[in-house]
C-alpha cells in the first residue's frame, strides 16, 4: 500500500484558498459597534411588516385524538410593523424570543400564540406583530373493517396578529387529503368510476379565539373528511380496501359538492365566525387539477 506525503490540515486549507484573518481596525465589542438599525431619521414610509420567514423550530401540540400530545416541527414567520422614523428592527430578538418560549415547553394553541405575538411586539418595541406557523399534525386512525391502526397526518396552520390599538385577530387552518369519486363518471359508465385524491383546505376564525375543551384541528378535519367520498387510511388490508372502495362508490363528489358540504358543517358550528373552503382534486383522467372555493362570514 502506497503512503502519500500528507500535508497538515492547516496546510491543506491554505492550499485550497484559506487565508489568515485580516488585522482589522473596526471594533469587536458590541458596545463600541455602530448600530445602524437604531439610528433615527425620516425613512419615508412605515412598514406593514418586517421580520423573518421560513423558520424551522420544534414545538408541542395537543389534540383530542391520539397521540394526545406530540412534538412536531413548526415553520414560522415572525414579523412586526416598523415606524417611519426607524431604519430597521433587531431581527435576532425574534429567534431569541422563540427559543425562550421553546425552553419553557411552548404548546401551540390560540391562547399561547396570542401571548407570544403580544410579547413579540413588546420585545421589538413596535405597535404590532404577526406570527404565522404551519406544522404537520399526526393522529391515529383505524382501518374501517379490521381496525388496523396507523398514523395519518394533516397540515395545520395558525395565524395571529396583534395591534396595540385594535387587539388580536386570528385564523386557523387545515389541509386534509381525501378520496373523491366522480359522480359524472359513475352515472355514465356501465361499471366503475374514476376517483382521485383531493385536498380540502379550510381556514376559519372563531367568535372567541380560545380552544377550551374543543380541538379546532379535529373540528376542521371532521368537516372535510365526513363529506368526502372516502377518507384516507395509513393501513388497509383486503377487507378494508373493499370497504373503502364501496364507500367511495356510494358517495360520489364533485369539487363543487365538497366545498358546499364542508361549508354546511362549518356553518352549523356555532363557535365559527367565518370560513373559507377550497377543494383541489388531482384528476386521475386529466393532467390538470379541478378546484373550487367558497368563503362565508356570519357577520
Curated annotation (Swiss-Prot):
One of its GO terms (biological process) is tetrahydrofolate biosynthetic process. It catalyses: GTP + H2O = 7,8-dihydroneopterin 3'-triphosphate + formate + H(+). It comes from Halalkalibacterium halodurans (strain ATCC BAA-125 / DSM 18197 / FERM 7344 / JCM 9153 / C-125) (Bacillus halodurans). Pathway: Cofactor biosynthesis; 7,8-dihydroneopterin triphosphate biosynthesis; 7,8-dihydroneopterin triphosphate from GTP: step 1/1. The lineage of its organism: Bacteria, Bacillati, Bacillota, Bacilli, Bacillales. InterPro entries: GTP_cyclohydrolase_FolE2, GTP_cyclohydrolase_FolE2/MptA. The keyword Hydrolase applies. Residues 1-25 are annotated as: Disordered. The gene is folE2. Keywords: Hydrolase. GO terms for molecular function: GTP cyclohydrolase I activity. NCBIfam families: PRK13674.1-1. Its EC number is 3.5.4.16. This is GTP cyclohydrolase FolE2.
Amino acid at each position: 500500500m502506497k503512503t502519500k506525503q500528507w500535508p497538515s490540515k492547516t496546510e491543506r486549507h491554505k492550499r485550497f484558498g484559506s487565508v489568515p484573518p485580516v488585522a482589522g481596525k473596526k471594533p469587536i465589542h458590541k458596545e463600541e459597534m455602530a448600530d445602524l438599525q437604531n439610528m433615527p431619521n425620516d425613512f419615508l414610509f412605515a412598514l406593514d411588516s418586517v421580520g423573518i420567514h421560513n423558520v424551522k423550530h420544534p414545538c408541542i401540540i395537543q389534540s383530542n385524538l391520539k397521540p394526545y400530545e406530540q412534538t412536531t416541527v413548526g415553520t414560522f414567520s415572525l414579523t412586526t410593523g416598523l415606524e417611519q422614523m426607524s431604519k430597521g428592527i433587531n431581527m435576532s430578538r425574534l429567534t431569541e424570543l422563540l427559543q425562550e418560549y421553546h425552553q419553557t415547553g411552548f404548546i401551540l394553541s390560540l391562547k399561547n400564540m396570542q401571548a407570544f405575538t403580544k410579547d413579540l411586539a413588546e420585545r421589538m418595541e413596535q405597535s404590532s406583530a404577526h406570527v404565522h406557523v404551519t406544522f404537520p399534525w399526526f393522529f391515529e386512525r383505524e382501518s374501517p373493517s379490521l381496525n388496523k391502526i396507523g398514523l395519518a397526518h394533516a397540515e395545520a396552520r395558525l395565524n395571529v396578529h396583534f395591534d396595540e390599538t385594535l387587539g388580536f385577530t386570528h385564523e386557523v387552518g387545515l389541509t386534509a387529503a381525501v378520496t373523491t369519486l366522480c359522480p359524472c363518471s359513475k352515472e355514465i359508465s356501465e361499471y366503475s368510476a374514476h376517483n382521485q385524491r383531493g385536498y380540502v383546505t379550510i381556514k376559519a376564525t372563531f367568535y372567541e379565539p380560545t380552544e377550551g375543551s374543543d380541538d379546532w384541528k379535529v373540528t376542521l378535519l371532521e368537516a372535510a373528511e365526513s363529506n368526502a367520498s372516502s377518507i384516507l387510511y395509513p393501513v388497509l388490508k383486503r377487507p378494508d380496501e373493499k370497504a373503502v372502495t364501496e364507500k367511495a362508490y356510494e358517495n360520489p363528489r364533485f369539487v363543487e359538492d365538497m366545498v358546499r358540504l364542508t361549508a354546511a358543517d362549518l356553518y352549523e358550528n356555532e363557535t365559527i365566525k367565518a370560513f373559507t373552503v377550497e377543494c383541489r382534486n388531482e384528476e386521475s383522467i386529466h393532467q390538470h387539477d379541478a378546484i373550487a372555493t367558497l368563503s362565508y362570514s356570519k357577520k
